[in-house]
């Protein structure tokens, strides 16, 4: 399968933005607005992340970059060409940014689970030659949970090309005040620019 994107520019590197089931996905439009200034961009939302995107934001994002969803993995299987979307996406990308990275997705990828397009891509990722950047976003108690620490340590041990953008402390969507909010979008974009392989 040929990977197609909107407004392709040979002078830019190729970045995949993964969106997961965290309320911080409401910042996806702002993230895309800033990332497309620096990268050829493809967005892969998990099914739960779509619940946090308004119709207007989804329409805006799809007008600026290509979106691949879980169903695209199965609709584009080509047995004759031996093509798989998650492999084609890996080959296309220079780097992947998962922002926000929910507790659920963090747990999945740190344990090698691959039950959707995004986690299948991560399971097939080339950690030796390509960077993977995660910006976790979750409730404070989820962030401070011992499992989260183990998941982060596991991912960091895989490769020096795995980067974690720690969350920040603020009043969270649920009303709690504490660590767990996704880092500010401009800082995520700057970090991605500076750590792209």
UniProtKB/Swiss-Prot annotation:
Its EC number is 4.1.1.36. The active site is at 174 (proton donor). One of its GO terms (molecular function) is FMN binding. It catalyses: N-[(R)-4-phosphopantothenoyl]-L-cysteine + H(+) = (R)-4'-phosphopantetheine + CO2. Its cofactor is FMN. InterPro entries: Flavin_trans-like, Flavoprotein. Transmembrane segments: none annotated. Substrate binds at residue 139. Binds 1 FMN per subunit. One of its GO terms (biological process) is coenzyme A biosynthetic process. Keywords: Coenzyme A biosynthesis, Decarboxylase, Flavoprotein, FMN, Lyase. GO terms for cellular component: phosphopantothenoylcysteine decarboxylase complex. Homotrimer. Necessary for the biosynthesis of coenzyme A. Catalyzes the decarboxylation of 4-phosphopantothenoylcysteine to form 4'-phosphopantotheine. Belongs to the HFCD (homooligomeric flavin containing Cys decarboxylase) superfamily. This is Putative phosphopantothenoylcysteine decarboxylase. It comes from Dictyostelium discoideum (Social amoeba).
């Amino acid at each position: 399968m040929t990977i197609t994107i909107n407004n392709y520019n040979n002078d830019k590197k190729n970045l995949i933005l993964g969106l997961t089931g965290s309320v911080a996905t409401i910042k996806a439009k702002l993230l895309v607005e800033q990332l497309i200034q620096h990268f050829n961009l493809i967005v892969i939302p998990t099914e739960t992340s779509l619940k946090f995107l308004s119709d207007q934001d989804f329409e805006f994002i799809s007008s600026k970059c290509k979106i691949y969803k879980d169903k695209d993995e199965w609709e584009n299987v080509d047995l004759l060409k031996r093509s798989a979307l998650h492999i084609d996406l890996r080959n296309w990308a220079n780097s992947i940014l998962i922002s926000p990275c929910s507790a659920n997705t963090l747990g999945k990828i740190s344990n090698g689970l691959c039950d959707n397009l995004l986690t299948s891509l991560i399971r097939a990722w080339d950690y030796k030659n390509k960077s993977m950047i995660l910006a976790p976003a979750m409730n404070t108690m989820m962030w401070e949970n011992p499992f989260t620490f183990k998941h982060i340590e596991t991912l960091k041990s895989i490769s020096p090309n795995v980067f974690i953008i720690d969350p920040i402390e603020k009043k969270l969507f649920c009303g709690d005040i504490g660590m767990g909010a996704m880092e500010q979008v401009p800082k995520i974009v700057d970090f991605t620019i500076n750590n792209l392989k």
